[in-house]
Structure formats: C-alpha cells, structure tokens
C-alpha cells in the first residue's frame, strides 16, 4: 500500500496537495484586528476565492489531486467522542478551559455537524452568537470591545505552515504567534483520526513544545537533506530538536540551517529561498551579503545522539556538496534590481511552488521574476494574485504537499 505521506524533495512531481479555500474568516478581519491576526490588509473574499479556485484548477489540470484541510478535518471528527475531545481542547486553547463560556461554546459547536463545526471554528465565533444563560466572573469581565469569543483563523489558507511533510512522516508544528497556534491542533486530529492518515504516518515532532518551528521554514531538498530557516517563526532550538529525531529515526543525515532576517516581510525561509530544479533555486538578494554569502550551519548526526555542526557562509558551495552537484544556479528575485526585488519579494516573488523538476506555480504579479525564471529554462504557470497576495503568502505558502514522486 502506498504511504499516506511521501515527500522526499521540493521538486518531485506533485501527486497530492492539501489546500484550504479561504472562507468567511477573511471577512472577520477588521482594521483593528489586523495586527493581532497577522495581516497587513484585508483581502476581498469573493475575488480571493475565485483566485484560489484558479490556483486549485491549475494544479488539478496538471493531474494533481487536491484535498482540502477543512474537509479532512470534518472527516476526522465524525465520531462523537473524538469531536467532544477536540472541542474541549480547541475551546481551552481559545482561552476557556473551564467555566460558563467554555460550556456555552461547547453546547453551541457540538450541536453542529462536523463540517459546519470546523467551518465555524475557522471562521471564528462571535460573542453575540453564543447564549450565556448564567454569567460568571470571566464572562462578565470579558473584553466587550472584542467581538469574538474564538478568534477567526484567516491564515488557514496558508496550509504550508502548521505542518510539514518530510519523507513518510511530518512535523506537526508549534506555531509562533497565538493567531495561528490552533491551526496545528486541527492537523493533529486529521493525522490521528482521518482514515486516510490514521496509523499510517510518522510524526517527527509534535506541537507539544515550547520552541517554535513552521512549515514555511522547512524545505525538503532530497531524501536525506533538509534546509531549515532560522527566522522570525523558527528557533534554532526547534531545529536541533527535529534534527535529533530525524537523525535517529529516518534517512535524513544533513540539515542546512540558514539564518535569515527576523522580520515580517521575510517571515519564513520560503519567502526568500525556494528550490525549483535539481540545481536551481530562487533567492531574494537581501538575504545575501554583497559577495553572495549567508550564515548557515550544516548539522549531521554525531555520537550517542549528539549533533555535529559546521558554520559556513558560501551557500552555493554548501548546496553543491550536500546535493552532489557541480553547479548551483541561484536566480535572484526581481532580477536583483534594488527596487523591483523587494517589491516582488513583498508580493511573494520568491515563494514558488514546484510541481515537477523545473516546473513551478507563481503569482502573475511578479512578472520580472517570472520572466527571469523562464530565461533560466523554468516552465512557469502563473496564477491570479490581486487578493490572495494581501495575506503575504504565495503558492508555496498556500500548499502542503502530501505525496510527491521521488527524484
């Protein structure tokens, strides 16, 4: 039987991918809540949905199976006992472990069918929707200026981050910011209780940690090499932790930890660096020094479960050695222009989704970067992006590969 998850590269022909179609959670962003919910702008939902449907169709037209996060979650929660356990944890992680608000939310959500319940949780639950019959101190002292008892999850359409497929398993990630932490709880239940995955996948690292790692920083370069960003959203300690697990229980023996600026514009490694062919990568010039260097550390398994570590700055040489290539082609976002590069990187010009070696999906708005990719022999499928890009994530961010062919 084929493995439920199988991803041994960034570029192997994509067979199955998990998406989330943006829903009403997008319309529950307000100017006052944008910072709290990690948004810089408010997408126009009807157009964002059309753009997302175009993205999904672009993938299915290439023979790729598209499965949806929200549907997988509903199927995982068909059992009443599992659904009740899930709701207890979800409500607790929303700030209500016990009390009348917890009980009112449980009554409100448990009455729904699993699909409606998941959709409502992602959309957010307004205080006005829930009937609190006998108030307690927590309920009467709740911030009346904030309309939600359970915050919306507008970042859910970036399915890359709450988990990362690696080999025949995945990491279920401890997210950095509160706005996204509950997303990976849904992943946990999908993997534990959806028949497609239950009992069939290895979990290299679960979400029950103090240190953070997110899927946008986890790049699977081949069947034994990973690149992981040390970033705003992923800590060095988390990288060492997952390295120990992978070195012990998998074929992975090399992790390249790449240090990038810790800011919102470059929140993950895949916003500035992605693999698009056997020896070709996109790179945002701003992460490199004038002579093309970037701090990176190569981790290998040592004795007795320890990790050996070597510091380097020449990323080309590190990649050539790790991937056994004579040359590495780093293709600069925006052709390296000091104005075009940061503009197109802001709109995810570096965030390419490889669907086969030398074949990528990109946002249409990044035309300078797209033309340069074509000049380097890459086949580019452009997708519409006027509203989706307002969330600060591109095609790689919006997709979680589940199965790829080996390269």
Curated annotation (Swiss-Prot):
Entry annotated with the keyword Hydrolase: yes
Gene Ontology CC annotation, any one: cytoplasm
Group of enzyme by EC: hydrolase
Classification via Gene3D superfamilies: Arginine deiminase, L-arginine/glycine Amidinotransferase, Chain A
GO BP term, pick one: arginine deiminase pathway
Entry annotation: catalytic residues: 397
Gene Ontology terms for molecular function: arginine deiminase activity
Catalytic activity: L-arginine + H2O = L-citrulline + NH4(+)
Pathway named in the protein's UniProt entry: Amino-acid degradation; L-arginine degradation via ADI pathway; carbamoyl phosphate from L-arginine: step 1/2
Record field: transmembrane: none
Family: Belongs to the arginine deiminase family.
Protein name, as recorded: Arginine deiminase
Upper lineage: Bacteria, Bacillati, Bacillota, Bacilli, Lactobacillales
